[in-house]
């Protein structure tokens, strides 16, 4: 009789645990992650330097079609805008309210089969410019994995991201990158430009990421950390947030701002 009670208790516990697991993910420490939209601490705005990205992804549509004159060959381009929780090192805060069928489609070869997003004509026109990965339906992956946790509608989410990207392109920081295409620059010089725009000490709100090609370090991504309330005008002053301690860039002291076109192997 006692054994039956113990077994019954174990079954009930397993059922309740399964139900709770369905509501959330698991953090790096095994704790439950609440997947309620809007329950996060800050955004990571991931901006890609597309020429360097394309060195390692030459088969992608957006890389095959890239030209030196296109926006993403001369400016940081939108990769993603990720709602983040502190301590969530494995980024389990994702797919908020997304069904299993849609989640199972979240693979590069099936992104274009994910449910179509509701965007205004203006956003639908701008997004392919600022997010070149639109050619591979990256916007679907970014929305269903990350955007659904923002608490925003898809159109507002992408419109805000595009506006911010355009403002960064026009900043001293953005122009420094554009003016040094093909050149080697130092991390400090780039971060100094960021502080010219956003104030002394603002470099603590940004991380630089590099890839290697032909033994050379190439700037591949910039991540800027923002408060939950995004600036409607895209101007970032006063909108920064400190990232989780696990967020660290990997660029060396100096690196190259790659130009469009593939380097010879």
Predicted features and spans:
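Catalytic cores of phosphodiester-bond-cleaving enzymes
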Residues: 23-180
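C-terminal, well-folded lobe of enzymatic/effector domains
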Residues: 23-27, 119-265
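Generic hydrophobic-segment detector
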Residues: 7-8, 70
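Bacterial N-terminal signal peptides
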Residues: 9-15
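Sec/Tat signal peptide C-region and signal peptidase I cleavage site
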Residues: 18-22
């Amino acid at each position: 009789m006692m054994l039956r009670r113990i077994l019954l208790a174990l079954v009930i516990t397993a059922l309740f645990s399964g139900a709770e697991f369905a509501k959330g993910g698991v953090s790096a420490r095994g704790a439950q992650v609440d997947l309620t939209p809007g329950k996060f601490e800050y955004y990571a705005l991931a901006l890609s330097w597309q020429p360097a990205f394309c060195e390692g992804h030459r088969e992608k549509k957006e890389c095959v079609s890239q030209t030196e004159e296109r926006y993403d060959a001369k400016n940081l381009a939108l990769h993603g805008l990720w709602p983040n929780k502190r301590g969530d090192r494995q980024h389990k805060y994702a797919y908020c309210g997304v069904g299993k069928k849609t989640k199972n489609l979240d693979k590069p070869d099936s992104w274009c089969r994910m449910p179509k997003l509701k965007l205004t004509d203006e956003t639908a026109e701008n997004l392919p410019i600022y997010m070149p990965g639109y050619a591979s339906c990256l916007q679907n992956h970014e929305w269903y994995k990350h955007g659904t946790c923002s608490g925003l509608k898809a159109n507002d989410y992408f419109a805000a991201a595009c506006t911010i990207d355009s403002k960064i392109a026009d900043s001293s920081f953005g122009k420094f990158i554009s003016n040094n295409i093909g050149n080697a620059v130092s991390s400090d010089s780039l971060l100094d430009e960021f502080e010219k725009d956003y104030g002394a000490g603002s470099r603590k709100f940004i991380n630089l990421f590099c890839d290697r090609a032909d033994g050379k370090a190439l700037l591949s991504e910039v991540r800027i950390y923002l408060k939950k309330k995004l600036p409607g005008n895209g101007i970032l002053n006063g909108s920064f947030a400190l990232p989780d301690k696990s967020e660290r860039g990997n660029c060396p002291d100096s690196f190259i701002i790659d130009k469009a076109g593939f380097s010879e192997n």
